[in-house]
Amino acid sequence: MCATDNAPAANAAPEKPSNVGVEVGHTGEQTNPYGANPADFLSNVSKFQLIESTLREGEQFASAFFDTETKIEIAKALDDFGVDYIELTSPAASEQSRSDCEAICKLGLKAKILTHIRCHMDDARLAVSTGVDGVDVVIGTSQFLRQYSHGKDMNYIAQSAVEVIEFVKSHGIEIRFSSEDSFRSDLVDLLNIYRTVDKIGVNRVGIADTVGCANPRQVYELVRTLKSVVSCDIECHFHNDTGCAIANAYTALEAGANLIDVSVLGIGERNGITSLGGLMARMIAADRDYVLSKYKLHKLRDLENLVADAVQVNIPFNNPITGFCAFTHKAGIHAKAILANPSTYEILNPADFGLTRYIHFANRLTGWNAIKSRVDQLNLHLTDAQCKDVTAKIKKLGDVRSLNIDDVDSIIREFHADVTSTPTVAATEGPAVEDEPAAKKAKTEE
């Protein structure tokens, strides 16, 4: 794609890189030698499901306020994208939350609708009355939460869990039981409560890294251990306080978890949870065919823009997939390789997401291969040697100031005009060669 004529300077900010780049085609199939080990029979990297929590966890984001119309718009967009479950705020949170839950349940979406409640019978009764497809029950199990939050011991937690689970099951809908603050809970307590709820028939149990303290190794060990204790599915919820949410989610799937909680842009309490787009990037690198068959990835940018507008934030420049430079290549060495085969410096194919890649050539780091590509786009003809010469001019100006695409195009066109207007003299045409004695005489007279 040719860059626009009214492009800003190359260092101007956060606009789509289409203003400063060259689109190039994708050649060759993406391959990843570091994908999931096919011999690992416990891995669910190629058969995971998403519980999308923008309308529950995302409502806990500091600047979030979703009115009913916005919630419905987001729910429809998530459903169109292809998420398996949509999780909603507890109807016990407020009267409007209950009304919104009922409204979304009536939309007839393909995704199953869940609501997230405390492990309490009052909440359970209210939840099943809204028409949801499932209920996600949670209660804190760490010493911190047992002492400073709800004040209950593990016996009380187990009894409450059994009562709520049996009630929800009696209404014929799905039920998940999750511990809160799982990674700071006593392992014996944790496994005992999971074993108890598994025996009475929960659809899945949940592990929650509520404070974002877990690392991938801890996640792998806990999920593997839990896998040997329960027969139901395992769902995982990871906060991003220490930057491990995406890595932890992927590791959980490798260890045998079945479902991951995500939100658009990762919005949620504090700095949020595993982001939908970030996890899509990680998963498509592991199993492209599965992800492409399941999710409408070309809808991701619009989905993120919708939520970003709703919570009044900008999409981060380094956001996986949709960050404004996610598929922009600047260094000359990179550009040369990308022009030959995009897989040299890309593990993701932008076309899978309805996006394009760009070669950012308006800078002093550019290489002559990138400039030659731009020359071709301008329908001009320069030899390789001439492309190298004009690249040197561009680099020289780039050492003085920031460049934009108009600067580069102007240099290229002026250079092209100069070389095409200068008569080309054949070496075999003797009369056109300057007379050597006369030339020496002229220099002597100077």
From Swiss-Prot:
Keywords attached to this entry:
Amino-acid biosynthesis, Lysine biosynthesis, Magnesium, Manganese, Metal-binding, Mitochondrion, Transferase, Transit peptide
Quote the pathway field.
Amino-acid biosynthesis; L-lysine biosynthesis via AAA pathway; L-alpha-aminoadipate from 2-oxoglutarate: step 1/5
Active-site residues from the entry = H334
Q: Which reaction does it catalyse?
A: acetyl-CoA + 2-oxoglutarate + H2O = (2R)-homocitrate + CoA + H(+)
Q: List the cofactors.
A: Mg(2+); Mn(2+)
Q: Which GO terms describe its cellular component?
A: mitochondrion
Which domain of life, per UniProt?
Eukaryota
Q: Which residues bind Mg(2+)?
A: E57, H237, H239
Q: Name one GO biological process term.
A: lysine biosynthetic process via aminoadipic acid
Compositionally biased residues, Low complexity: 1-14
PROSITE patterns noted in UniProt? AIPM_HOMOCIT_SYNTH_1, AIPM_HOMOCIT_SYNTH_2, PYR_CT
UniProt feature, compositional bias: Basic and acidic residues: 437-446
A GO molecular function for this record? Answer: homocitrate synthase activity
Report residue spans for region: Disordered.
1-36, 422-446
What EC class does the entry list? transferase
Q: Which family does it belong to?
A: Belongs to the alpha-IPM synthase/homocitrate synthase family. Homocitrate synthase LYS20/LYS21 subfamily.
Function of the protein: Catalyzes the aldol-type condensation of 2-oxoglutarate with acetyl-CoA to yield homocitrate. Carries out the first step of the alpha-aminoadipate (AAA) lysine biosynthesis pathway.
UniProt-listed PANTHER family: HOMOCITRATE SYNTHASE, CYTOSOLIC ISOZYME-RELATED (PTHR10277:SF48), HOMOCITRATE SYNTHASE-RELATED (PTHR10277)
From the Swiss-Prot or TrEMBL record, give the protein name: Homocitrate synthase, mitochondrial
Q: Which gene encodes it?
A: LYS1
